[in-house]
Structure formats: structure tokens, C-alpha cells
Amino acid sequence: EGIYRHYRTLAESTDTPIILYNVPGRTGVNIKSETTLRLATDCPNIIGIKEASGNVDQVRAIMLEKPDPFIVLSGDDHLSLSFIKEGAEGVISVIGNAYPELFSRLIHLCLENRFEEAEIIQQRLEGMYYLMFVDGNPAGIKELLYQKGLIRHNILRLPLVSASDSTSTLIARVRNQIEQR
């Protein structure tokens, strides 16, 4: 009930569209599908959710009862294909920052119900999904972007720290595999 009241209070204080972000791995609390659906129904400016619970059943439950035009987006790159199969409309991505064309292609193939083709790209990126979070977010993606020359440094502000040497080495190895294809 506390989560519902919190978001309802936010929604009532502004006309700005709001996208919920369900990331229990960071917050320690899951926004249950029932709460999401209540907010979607009761608060017209809550327009969607970035669903990063890792729970396909929860996404399915939201998709079955959500009002139109409430948007469901994956917040887990590695589950985007599965979430889109359940009806999610897209993703707010981490890996897409480093491989925008490739990841966009994967998502567009999913949205076109071309899942076999999407699965080929999914398998190509699979090893990197995991490495993005080994040393915590955003250490992995910052290291990958640095290695690709897309940012000038991979330094994070404390208490966050950069990717470890072993993770950096693995990112370089998997990056080489991805980019050779």
C-alpha cells in the first residue's frame, strides 16, 4: 500500500507523464503487478513501467489486465525477448548504449514477431549482458563504452568503483567475439 500511495502522491502533484521503475534488485522491494495495475488505472499520467523484476509471470499478469495505452517496457536486456513475447512494447536498455544498432535490430525483430532471427542476436550478446553487472551497474557499461572509445574514461564516483581488471579483460574478450561477427 505504501508504494501505491507514494506513486499516487507523485502523480497527483504533477501533470508530467511518469514511468514507474520496478527494480527490486536495487530497491529491495518489488512493485507487485496488482499495485502497477491500480496505479495505471487510477493515475492517468502514470503512462508505463520499466519492468526489471526479472519475472516473466509478473509481466504477463500486467499485460493481461493493463489499461490502454499503458506501456510496459523491459528493464532487463537479457529478458527483453521474453518480455516482448508477452506483449511488452520495448526496452530501456543498458547494452543498447554500446551496441545501439545491433540491440535495436534485436528489439525490432521481436516486435515484428521474428523471434528466431532475434534469438541469433540475443545469443551473440548473451555473454555481455552478464558482464555488465558483475561489478555492479554502471561499472560494466562504462568499461565497455571506454574500450570502444565512446567515452574518455571509466572512472566512477565513490562509493562506486570501476570494473575490476578481470572483468575488464572478460569484457574485452566478449567484445571481440561480438564485433568479429
Named regions from a protein language model:
Residues E1-G28, R38:
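Active-site beta->alpha loop and helix N-cap motifs at the rims of alpha/beta catalytic domains
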Residues G2-Y7, K32-T36, L81, I141:
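Short, acidic/polar
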Residues N22-V23, N45-I46, R157:
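Glycine-rich phosphate-binding "P-loop"
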Residues I95, Y99-R181:
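C-terminal alpha-helical cap/extension of soluble enzyme domains
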